[in-house]
Amino acid sequence: MRRLVFPLLVLAAAALAASAFAATRTSDPVVKWKTAQFGSILATKGHLALYTWNQEKVRKVKCTGACAKVWPPITIPHGTMAPKHIAGVMGTFGEVMRPDGKTQLTFNGHPLYTYHGDTPTKILCNGVDGWYVVKVH
């Protein structure tokens, strides 16, 4: 019996340490939102449309500095993991590290942004300079 106690204590301590350092899953940072203008799109929980930029390659961030002020990136807190899937959305979510060290949410590998001039009732920049609303099924 004594021989089992020490290995079990070591195993329990290792499991506890691993759980302390594991990243936690963030709550779904985006939602599927039905609009009259575009149909179903990805949006923030506050119903701001999400965009991708055709100047960026998969998992490569190019919009920084002044660009990121106009097109704020969707970031997730340090130490959390993006959900891989969101109910009702076909596609895969992931993460990319931005040059400033923040973690940005991606959809099918493409970094996600909002537009600073949009409101929940106005989606202003679909198709402007290579920025497109993320339409989903």
Role assignments for model-derived ranges:
Residues 3-4, 21-137:
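Compact beta-sheet-dominated domain cores in extracellular/mature segments
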Residues 1-2, 16:
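N-terminal targeting/docking segments
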Residues 7-16:
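Bacterial N-terminal signal peptides
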